Amino acid sequence: MTNRKEIIGDAEKIVIKIGTTSISREDGSLNNEFMDTIASQVSELHRAGKQIILVSSGSIGIGIEILDLGCRPKEIPVRQAAAAVGQGVLMQHWTEAFQKYGLNVAQILLTYDSFTNRLTYLNLRNSISTLLSYGVIPIINENDPICVHEIEATLGDNDKLSAMVASKMEADLLILFTDIDGLYDKNPKRHDDAVLLRTVEEITPTIESYGGNPTSMKGVGGMRTKIDAAKICNISGCYMVIANSNVDDGIRRILDGEELGTLFLTNQFVHKNRIRWIILARSSGSIVVDTGAKEALAKRMSLLPSGVLGVAGTFDRGDIVKLECDGVVFGKGITDYTSEELKAIKGKQTNEIADILGYKNYDHVVQKDNIGLFK
């Protein structure tokens, strides 16, 4: 049996994600008692010297209730309007909850693009670090009113976003609170014989198959995005726990080592921060390479045009692209040539680049220090 106390008991920097179904009652109203309980537990950790970052869903669900929409809106502008209406109310309640314990909070609204531009990401990291140094509790949510891809895929879901925050802030632990007890081998709402997994050592295809689909009207009830979040944590050296928010004193009990929910162990190999940024950032396209090029990249060599078979998508110099071989994406990198330039020089030798393009910026397509390979 895994000794959780030894693994996560000493976590110093902790990201806690509160799901929509945890923060809302059945009638759609905010669960103020739950929010107060979270604030109380966080204040205890704060007094113990731990740094806490809160990621809170719920703005769209609140907006749905305030606007009396009745059911989940299909139109993206309506969802975004609901988020805009609900976000202020959400922060007001969090502010009041933490003020009872003498703590200040700060609102931070993010999109996944916040992590793609490295300068923006570094500024974000510095801002959050400064807030933590002043004893402020950062409360992060997705900036739904300006998001299209994220909001279309999930309704107010912050699982992957919270994992990105944990990764970028080099957190020790991510806790995902939801409305079920953890990861099961099948849907417990449909199968009485479903077995709860207490520990996941490795995210295998079998583990991935346990991911479900969105089932909740105001949030996401499935496990697919939570497993995706665990993948991000795995390569970032961050442990992750999925737990039921209805459990009394859940945060304290998790840190005390109780077998609550599902614990995802982390990879012992952790990428450097810059490489982690490359791997986790959104890609603009793909470069398809041959087997020889893939083997060369595994030996820490740069990608040359001779190893390029083709490109997919449209991208510019400096964009992050996927690296693909035999139909499998095995890494990401920062390209030094555009997609149009690569179409012209793919499969060519470096001494042919200038003759083909009329100029040559680099001998390589992707420089070795700008490549992050999946493990």
Swiss-Prot record:
InterPro entries on file: AceGlu_kinase-like_sf, Asp/Glu/Uridylate_kinase, G5K_ProB, Glu/AcGlu_kinase, Glu_5kinase, Glu_5kinase/COase_Synthase, Glutamate_5-kinase_CS, PUA
Binding site for ATP: 17, 178-179
Catalytic activity annotation: L-glutamate + ATP = L-glutamyl 5-phosphate + ADP
CDD domains per the UniProt record, alphabetical: AAK_G5K_ProB, PUA_G5K
Keyword vocabulary terms for this entry: Amino-acid biosynthesis, ATP-binding, Cytoplasm, Kinase, Nucleotide-binding, Proline biosynthesis, Transferase
Top-level enzyme category: transferase
Molecular functions (GO terms): ATP binding; glutamate 5-kinase activity; RNA binding
Family to which the UniProt record says this protein belongs: Belongs to the glutamate 5-kinase family.
NCBIfam families membership: proB (TIGR01027)
PANTHER family to which the protein is assigned, alphabetical: GLUTAMATE 5-KINASE
Protein name: Glutamate 5-kinase
Species of the source: Methanococcoides burtonii (strain DSM 6242 / NBRC 107633 / OCM 468 / ACE-M)
